[in-house]
Amino acid sequence: SIYEHAFDIDEHYRSEMAERALILDNDPRRYLVMPHMQAAAWDALQMLMENLAIDYPQWFSLVRDGDRWHWRNHLLQIDQPFIFGDAASLPCAPLEYIGRQVQGDFALLDQRDGDLYMDAGLVTSPADWSLAFDAGMSFKQWHAPVPMANQMGVFDRALKYLLNLQAGQPVRRLNWTLTINPRLDSSPETFHQWGADRGRITAQNVGQQVHLRVELQVMARLPRSNAVMFSIR
């Protein structure tokens, strides 16, 4: 069930984390946190660590003593004491640190002036979009390429709904698209690696090459920063 756990960990965990590490090493632009989003990054780290420790106690544990936290990830052999709020106490910035240990992509949306702005995130397996390109865009701006939906008022209603998300009441939705080959990273940055495959589809191979890509999207209000965390799994 998609409602069983807040964030899903499955049998592909280690391989997907290894792939994420390679992508981040080759293209650091897949990670972004604007200066005003530091509190949101710590918010996201807390939400992810707490939920992983609750839902998968055999793999993750979190012990807190005030601002002194101790995180253990048994799947990746990580044992990390740190001070919450002090980035220098972690091997890397907080969103990147926890993002390297959780399956799925994460965007942090700053809410201001009656809109949501994509001002932070860690995205290594997008379906035809780019965090580096969308950085700083408003909700409607980054959805502009979606055909017909804006004219139908879909994004007006979606934005109104998301602006009213309450802390502690996350919402989930499923999104789907068609993709060529079972590839997670179909970003514009890697188009030269996979784009030509679209022109090779024939009536004879369509059944083997075209895949239904289904994404579980979770939208949650972060309590300290009031940002919205948008996860895509």
Residue ranges: model-predicted function:
Residues 1-233:
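Extended, well-ordered protein cores
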